[in-house]
């Protein structure tokens, strides 16, 4: 079990990557740690890479993960989930559950596309920026 949290200042983004076997409790603990880094720096971009996990998390584990995102993550946060092709079915479930909870999450098979997507401004962020410019 291991995970790495890499904050990248120029992108205002935190990269969270998992490797090996990861019990659900530790999986969530790593996400909370990454969220804390985002909160401290006032950033809203998170890229989660699970391609190096040795096993595919079960549907209930992924459901718990997505539910946790929905209840604990700021609505302005963008989360890109990078998965392997055999993880895609479960990633689709995570995306659907998170979006029902109004979390901006998308899954990707290509890490470069995930990074491009997460760096885009959301509609809400654009409106906030316009509002600040008018003041």
Report each predicted region and the residues it spans.
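Amphipathic, Lys/Arg-enriched alpha-helical "gate/interface" segment within cytosolic domains
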Residues: 1-135
């Amino acid at each position: 079990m291991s995970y790495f949290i890499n904050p990248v200042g120029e992108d205002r983004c935190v990269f969270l990557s998992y490797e090996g076997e990861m019990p659900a409790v530790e999986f969530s603990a790593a996400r909370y740690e990454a969220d804390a880094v985002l909160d401290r720096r006032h950033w809203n971009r998170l890229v989660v890479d699970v391609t190096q996990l040795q096993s595919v998390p079960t549907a209930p584990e992924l459901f718990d993960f997505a539910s946790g995102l929905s209840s604990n993550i700021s609505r302005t946060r963008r989360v890109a989930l990078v998965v392997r092709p055999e993880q895609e079915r479960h990633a689709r479930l995570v995306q659907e559950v998170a979006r029902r909870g109004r979390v901006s999450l998308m899954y990707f098979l290509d890490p470069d596309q995930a990074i491009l997507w997460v760096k885009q401004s959301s509609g809400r962020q654009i409106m906030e920026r316009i509002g600040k410019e008018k003041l």
